[in-house]
């Protein structure tokens, strides 16, 4: 059974302790139980077993910026908005159990496919298939504009956490609160060129593979087997079945998937150019901007993917902050492996 170890708040609570008491503890850990309003806003979450849900309702599509974005939506249309952002090699299925939990708590939950995944498509065949970090964040800003969402709680992991971090840092007026797995993930090409200790470099083996033409062709040819290998390495204790993987892997059939993934990782190493029109944004991100919105960072105790130590990024968050380590063999795909803990963090971060 997974447990949550929380820094800067109550020390420990069991993830199986659900219902109003669980949310009460989650909120108090974030230092928000001092007011009568906070206490009256407690929400009862139903207990959920990871993997209880296998699909969303009918997907929606909307033109937003350079894309026609595919997305799932749950919960009341007039509820406070929460955007859940996935990473690589994952998709919206990472939140298939989180979304109904948050919807039952009254949130409008929106889960988009990032560029290069699922049913999201470029509006023009002429658009450069760019995977650099600032562009993915701009996609989400355009998506929020298209849905007329002025401000939302943003929560994600991997690419999704980085995207949420960027929006919180550069456009804090659009981000009510932040939940970021593995913390502060904003990077730069300069930082990406710095050598790491050998063991750390080994964890990034796929990035160096993608730097070669052989790697691009190999990923294109073997994207499902490749992604399943990454799942196993990133979440070594997660006993997912083939059906769970296959539901996500269908998203990798997107015609732009390989181009976006390869460009993303080559751009990080300064082996591929971005677009000049985004240079100013990248310069700002390279400065490592501090995030001031209320934030909860999270980490699984069995994350086999490269990730920073929480102490290394603590000073990157200047507002209300807590860190939660989710124990019990939880790996990189934290929302899908520990949906209850992730949903609790979203509610706690939102209720400042």
Short names for language-model regions:
Residues 330-338:
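Catalytic histidine-centered segment of alpha/beta-hydrolase-like enzymes
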Residues 74-119:
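Conserved HGGG/HGGXW glycine-rich cap/lid loop of the alpha/beta-hydrolase fold
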Residues 41-57, 66-69, 74, 81, ...:
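Flexible "cap/lid" subdomain of the alpha/beta-hydrolase fold that forms the substrate-access gate
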Residues 28-35:
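C-terminal segment of classical bacterial N-terminal signal peptides
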Residues 1-16, 23-26:
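N-terminal secretory signal peptides
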Residues 345-352:
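C-terminal alpha-helix
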Residues 59-61, 109-111, 323-325:
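Conserved beta-strand scaffold positions in the cores of enzyme catalytic domains, especially
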Residues 36-40:
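Boundary at the C-terminal end of the N-terminal hydrophobic targeting segment
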């Amino acid at each position: 059974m997974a447990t949550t170890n929380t820094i800067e708040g109550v020390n420990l609570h069991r993830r199986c302790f659900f219902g109003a008491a669980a949310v009460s503890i989650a909120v108090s850990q974030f230092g928000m139980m001092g007011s009568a309003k906070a206490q009256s806003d407690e929400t009862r979450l139903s207990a959920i077993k990871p993997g209880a849900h296998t699909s969303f309702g009918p997907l929606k599509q909307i033109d937003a910026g350079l894309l026609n974005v595919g997305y799932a939506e749950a919960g009341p249309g007039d509820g406070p908005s929460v955007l859940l952002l996935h990473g690589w090699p994952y998709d919206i299925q990472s939140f298939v159990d989180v979304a109904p939990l948050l919807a039952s708590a009254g949130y409008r939950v929106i889960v988009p496919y990032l560029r290069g995944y699922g049913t999201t498509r470029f509006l023009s065949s002429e658009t450069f298939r760019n995977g650099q970090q600032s562009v993915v964040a701009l996609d989400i800003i355009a998506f929020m504009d298209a849905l007329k969402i002025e401000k939302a709680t943003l929560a994600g992991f991997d690419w999704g956490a980085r995207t949420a971090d960027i929006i919180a840092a550069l456009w804090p007026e659009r981000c009510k609160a932040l939940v970021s797995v593995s913390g502060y993930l904003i990077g730069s090409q300069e930082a990406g060129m710095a050598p790491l200790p050998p063991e750390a470099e080994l964890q990034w083996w796929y990035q160096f593979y993608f730097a070669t033409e052989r790697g691009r062709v190999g990923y294109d040819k073997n994207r499902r087997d490749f992604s399943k290998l990454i799942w196993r390495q990133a979440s070594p204790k997660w006993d997912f079945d083939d059906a769970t993987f296959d539901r996500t892997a269908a998203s990798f059939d997107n015609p732009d998937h390989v181009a976006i993934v390869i460009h993303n990782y080559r751009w990080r190493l300064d082996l591929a150019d971005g677009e000049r029109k985004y240079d100013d944004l990248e310069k700002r991100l390279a400065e490592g901007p501090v995030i001031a919105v209320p934030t909860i960072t999270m980490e699984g105790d069995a994350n086999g993917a490269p990730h920073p130590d929480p102490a290394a990024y603590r000073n990157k968050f200047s507002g209300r902050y807590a860190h939660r380590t989710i124990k019990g063999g939880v790996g990189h795909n934290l929302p899908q492996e520990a949906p209850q803990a992730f949903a609790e963090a979203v509610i706690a971060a939102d209720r400042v």
